[in-house]
């Protein structure tokens, strides 16, 4: 195949960075374009080092800026769209989440048509499928089950609408007479080095003598390692660029998991942190039913105060459901259509993530020393 180029939106983020690193190994790839609203100095430095291996262009811009998207897509062969706002407690605001996640995706699809980009891979979310109730038990869900979120909370709704737009865009005519081929990947909860959620959990625990919060002991999910999610994106772009494989992949969505054992979010945090002295809170936590109704009351208070004050509840019903559900999926369809097999075993993923957690502990101790001197 002739030389090709790939645009990764949200490429400076947790998942996006891993996708960029894997793209470096792709055959005949001439340029990687990385679009993000802002690049952290350490990310910019890391990407600068990679420019000796391949042409890597960093583009700072807004996903809602049509001119920015038009320029970013010009001459690209593939778009991997990871950029989104992940907000499960409504901290950002409904309008912003819906604009970035839905309108941003629609504008990017339109830019692909104008620039005649034939391949579009969308990073969706498990929350497009659920869970809808903490009482509902869903195990080894597959794509044929056609599970769908019933939540009107901005994050799951925005991801559902964005994925719908992407899959409906499959088959669109491009400006040059070609055809747009799309697919969507629905990863489970993603963990690994650099995870913003694990970072927040561990830092909060470090400020509380190493005691991890106990919010989700009733959950049972199959988390997925970031390196394996990135690998699934590479396999998806290979499939959509291959005329023989594209027929079975275009317009499809895929669950992405790996061989990480099903467990609660609390257990995952403890597994990754116990070596460094972290422990679970021994105090009894509220049962999910009581926590759910407390969340409902807080949402009512927030609504009643909204004309005069922007009260942000610490949690909501959607978050309580997410943290207390049994919800696991199968990745057999990705195996069949994409040839997906995890690049990293559970043991490898665990060790890499634990080492990173250890570095956070070290940084915390050094920061404390600096304060005391």
From Swiss-Prot:
Catalytic activity: a 3beta-hydroxy-Delta(5)-steroid + NAD(+) = a 3-oxo-Delta(5)-steroid + NADH + H(+); a 3-oxo-Delta(5)-steroid = a 3-oxo-Delta(4)-steroid
Main location class: endoplasmic reticulum
Membrane topology reported for the UniProt record: Single-pass membrane protein
GO cellular component, one term: endoplasmic reticulum membrane
MF (Gene Ontology): 3-beta-hydroxy-Delta5-steroid dehydrogenase (NAD+) activity; oxidoreductase activity, acting on the CH-OH group of donors, NAD or NADP as acceptor; steroid Delta-isomerase activity
Location in the cell: Endoplasmic reticulum membrane; Mitochondrion membrane
One Pfam family, short name: 3Beta_HSD
Annotated signal sequence range: none
E.C. code: 1.1.1.145, 5.3.3.1
InterPro entries from the UniProt entry: 3Beta_OHSteriod_DH/Estase (IPR002225), Lipid_A_modif_metabolic_enz (IPR050177), NAD(P)-bd_dom_sf (IPR036291)
GO biological process: C21-steroid hormone metabolic process; steroid biosynthetic process
TM ranges: 292-309
Binding-site positions, NAD(+): 159
Active site (UniProt): 155 (proton acceptor)
Pathway note: Lipid metabolism; steroid biosynthesis
Protein task: 3-beta-HSD is a bifunctional enzyme, that catalyzes the oxidative conversion of Delta(5)-ene-3-beta-hydroxy steroid, and the oxidative conversion of ketosteroids. The 3-beta-HSD enzymatic system plays a crucial role in the biosynthesis of all classes of hormonal steroids.
Protein family: Belongs to the 3-beta-HSD family.
Protein name: 3 beta-hydroxysteroid dehydrogenase/Delta 5-->4-isomerase
Organism: Sus scrofa (Pig)
């Amino acid at each position: 195949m002739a030389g090709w180029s790939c645009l990764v939106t949200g490429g400076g983020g947790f998942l996006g960075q891993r996708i960029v690193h894997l793209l470096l190994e792709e055959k005949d790839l001439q340029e990687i374009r990385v679009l993000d609203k802002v690049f952290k100095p350490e990310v910019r430095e890391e990407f600068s080092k990679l420019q000796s291996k391949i042409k890597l262009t960093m583009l700072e811009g807004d996903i809602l800026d049509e001119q920015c998207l038009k320029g970013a897509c010009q001459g690209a062969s593939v778009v991997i769209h990871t950029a989104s706002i992940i907000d499960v407690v409504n901290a950002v605001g409904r309008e912003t989440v819906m604009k970035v996640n839905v309108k941003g995706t629609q504008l990017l699809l339109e830019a692909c048509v104008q620039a005649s980009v034939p391949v579009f891979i969308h990073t969706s979310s498990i929350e497009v499928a659920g869970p809808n109730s903490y009482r509902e038990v869903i195990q080894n869900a597959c794509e044929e089950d056609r599970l769908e979120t019933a939540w009107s909370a901005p994050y799951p709704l925005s991801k559902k609408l964005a994925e719908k737009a992407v899959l409906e865009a499959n088959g669109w005519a491009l400006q040059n007479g070609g055809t747009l081929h799309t697919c969507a990947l629905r990863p489970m909860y993603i963990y690994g080095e650099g995870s913003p959620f694990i970072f927040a959990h561990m830092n909060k625990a470090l400020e509380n003598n190493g005691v991890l919060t106990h919010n989700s002991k009733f959950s049972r999910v199959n988390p997925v390692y970031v390196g394996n999610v990135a690998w699934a994106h590479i396999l998806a772009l290979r499939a959509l660029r291959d005329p023989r494989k594209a027929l079975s992949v275009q317009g499809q969505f895929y669950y992405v998991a790996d061989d990480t054992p099903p467990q609660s979010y609390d257990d995952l945090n403890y597994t990754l942190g116990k070596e460094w002295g972290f422990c679970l809170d021994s105090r009894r936590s509220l049962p999910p039913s009581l926590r759910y109704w407390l969340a409902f009351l807080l949402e009512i208070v927030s609504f009643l105060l909204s004309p005069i004050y922007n009260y942000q509840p610490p949690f909501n019903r959607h978050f309580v459901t997410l943290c207390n559900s049994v919800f696991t999926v199968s990745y057999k369809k990705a195996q069949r259509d994409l040839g997906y097999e995890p690049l990293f075993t559970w043991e490898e993923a665990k060790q890499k993530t634990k080492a990173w957690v250890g570095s956070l502990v070290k940084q915390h101790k050094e920061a404390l020393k600096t304060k005391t001197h």
